């Protein structure tokens, strides 16, 4: 809402600062972080009181988890989403369609994750509601979002897929683009969800990806920078940098409480929502393929589960000691902090590779 003050800059010139995306991105980051940090202890206490036993821990998982993680409350994604929403409403341009599309997907995926977490906690079971039904709901939200993105895209960009590195490589997929882009959003949500298995493991790579796509959104939403980098100029997407800034701030606030030993888990409430947000930003900025690079860690995690399940069904043998792959390394003797920090390093390297695609032509 503060963006609207820029329209009064003729009356009070300092209000002109609210025109700048970079300023508002910083404001969103600070606001979201402060909100989560300030209200975090109260939210954690409330969730612990309501949930009692907290998130159920896998009996077939690493045995150390049964001792160190049992009783920890889940649904910490509520903290992240609250901080994110407050910051976006305060600092983003309320007239920007891409902002609202991203917010709707984030809250929609968050609601699905919340219900799943609720069932797991109340039943003290790892099984929430039907996986097929959950994917169906996610797909409906994603398809609606992709149709909206196509509707608001500039002429010549709707239903088109851009390829990184290659100059002017953009293909008109027609309505198939809706299916592809929806797959990106749903896949991103579930990939982050799979990754969220150790203290701090998911939130830091999410913030790294958000920072990367915040930069991408800012550049492709600026006609001068887009022309210089020879990437597709996508009007209006620069405002998504503010959303990414809010995510980073909320993530930092959450990490304060999620750092090992975690006081709270984000749960499906957070992981599905944040993955959906990243997928939507990638779709809006026409950098869907780059998301597979920047979010390569998430791709690796979900691929390990797919490979494990497929191998066991086809051959009766497991490729990994345990899936997702972060548990595989735990079973090999890596300590939890080793797995987490090494995976963070991988996320940083992949983010830099993703940014490099902007310049390579």
From Swiss-Prot:
Membrane association type: Multi-pass membrane protein
Gene Ontology terms describing biological process: cell division; cell wall organization; peptidoglycan biosynthetic process; regulation of cell shape
Gene coding for it: mraY
GO cellular component terms, A-Z: plasma membrane
Main subcellular location of this protein, as a coarse class: membrane
Transmembrane feature ranges: 27-47, 72-92, 99-119, 139-159, 169-189, 200-220, 240-260, 264-284, 289-309, 338-358
Keyword annotations: Cell cycle, Cell division, Cell inner membrane, Cell membrane, Cell shape, Cell wall biogenesis/degradation, Magnesium, Membrane, Metal-binding, Peptidoglycan synthesis, Transferase, Transmembrane, Transmembrane helix
Keyword field contains Magnesium: yes
Localisation: Cell inner membrane
Pfam family, one: MraY_sig1
Record function comment: Catalyzes the initial step of the lipid cycle reactions in the biosynthesis of the cell wall peptidoglycan: transfers peptidoglycan precursor phospho-MurNAc-pentapeptide from UDP-MurNAc-pentapeptide onto the lipid carrier undecaprenyl phosphate, yielding undecaprenyl-pyrophosphoryl-MurNAc-pentapeptide, known as lipid I.
Cofactor names: Mg(2+)
EC numbers for this chain: 2.7.8.13
Protein name stated in the entry: Phospho-N-acetylmuramoyl-pentapeptide-transferase
Molecular function (Gene Ontology), one example: phospho-N-acetylmuramoyl-pentapeptide-transferase activity
Pathway in which the depicted protein is active: Cell wall biogenesis; peptidoglycan biosynthesis
Substrates-to-products reaction catalysed: UDP-N-acetyl-alpha-D-muramoyl-L-alanyl-gamma-D-glutamyl-meso-2,6-diaminopimeloyl-D-alanyl-D-alanine + di-trans,octa-cis-undecaprenyl phosphate = di-trans,octa-cis-undecaprenyl diphospho-N-acetyl-alpha-D-muramoyl-L-alanyl-D-glutamyl-meso-2,6-diaminopimeloyl-D-alanyl-D-alanine + UMP
InterPro entries, per database record: Glycosyl_transferase_4 (IPR000715), PNAcMuramoyl-5peptid_Trfase (IPR003524), PNAcMuramoyl-5peptid_Trfase_CS (IPR018480)
Family: Belongs to the glycosyltransferase 4 family. MraY subfamily.
Organism name: Methylobacterium nodulans (strain LMG 21967 / CNCM I-2342 / ORS 2060)
């Amino acid at each position: 809402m503060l963006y609207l003050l820029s329209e009064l800059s003729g009356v009070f010139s300092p209000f002109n600062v609210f025109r700048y995306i970079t300023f508002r991105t910083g404001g969103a980051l600070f606001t979201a972080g402060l909100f989560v940090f300030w209200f975090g202890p109260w939210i954690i206490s409330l969730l612990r009181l309501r949930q009692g036993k907290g998130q159920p821990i896998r009996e077939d998982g690493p045995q150390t988890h049964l001792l160190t993680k049992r009783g920890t409350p889940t649904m910490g994604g509520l903290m992240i989403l609250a901080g994110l929403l407050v910051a976006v409403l305060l600092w983003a341009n309320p007239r920007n369609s891409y902002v609202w599309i991203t917010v709707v997907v984030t809250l929609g995926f968050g609601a699905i994750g919340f219900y799943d977490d609720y069932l797991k906690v109340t039943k003290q079971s790892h099984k929430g509601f039907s996986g097929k039904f959950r994917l169906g709901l996610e797909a409906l939200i994603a398809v609606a979002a992709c149709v909206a993105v196509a509707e608001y895209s500039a002429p010549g960009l709707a239903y088109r897929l851009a390829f990184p590195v290659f100059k002017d490589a953009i293909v008109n997929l027609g309505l198939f683009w809706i299916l592809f882009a929806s797959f990106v959003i749903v896949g991103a949500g579930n990939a982050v969800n799979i990754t969220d298995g150790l203290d701090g493991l998911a939130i830091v790579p999410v913030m790294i990806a958000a920072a990367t796509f915040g930069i991408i959104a800012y550049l492709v939403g600026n006609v001068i920078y887009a022309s210089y980098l020879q990437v597709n100029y996508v009007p209006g997407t620069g405002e998504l940098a503010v959303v990414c800034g809010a995510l980073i701030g909320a993530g930092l606030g959450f990490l304060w409480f999620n750092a090992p030993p975690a006081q709270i888990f984000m749960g499906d409430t957070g992981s599905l929502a944040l993955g959906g947000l990243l997928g939507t930003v990638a779709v809006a900025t026409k950098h869907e393929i780059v998301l597979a690079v920047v979010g390569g860690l998430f791709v690796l995690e979900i691929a390990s589960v797919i490979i494990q399940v497929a191998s066991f069904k086809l051959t009766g043998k497991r490729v990994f000691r345990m899936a997702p792959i972060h548990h595989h390394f735990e079973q090999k003797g890596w300590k939890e902090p080793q797995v987490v920090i090494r995976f963070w390093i991988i996320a940083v390297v992949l983010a830099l590779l993703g940014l490099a695609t902007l310049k390579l032509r």
